[in-house]
Amino acid sequence: MLDTLISRSKIQKAFLFDVISKIYIATDSYPVNMQHYEICSELIDVLIDVTQIYGVDEEGGGSKFDKKSSSIIRLNHANPQENIVLYLREVDKCLALVCLINESEITKQHLINYNIDRFKEGLKKIFEHSHEITSAHQQQQAVKQQEEAKLL
């Protein structure tokens, strides 16, 4: 799914991060440049820090880091021929998609957002299906244990 996303959106690299551990749980099939991974991980740290300082809701409760959270940051240290932009979108409360995009492609942000929304929908369906399979398996195990208990 990430390969389709990056090819359709002209994204250079995409990471799906666990926001809490800042470890990527998925990436596209292209090789991982550790410098890119580190800068993407640091972006999550920065956003969490800023959210904790400025993002508390009016009731003083939860964080404002939600499904509408996103960030676009231009990297100044990048190669002059390679104007890279970091783009973060929250997938759910525990996952964030962080992409490296050529600055010339960010003008098509509406297309990128549309494709990311489709990616999020696909990921949600996978998680729901996985949950259904896990629940069915757990029910089968419970029935099996009950039957075994009756035999004893």
Tell me the role of every PLM-derived stretch.
Residues 1-152:
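Non-catalytic interaction/Regulatory regions outside core domains
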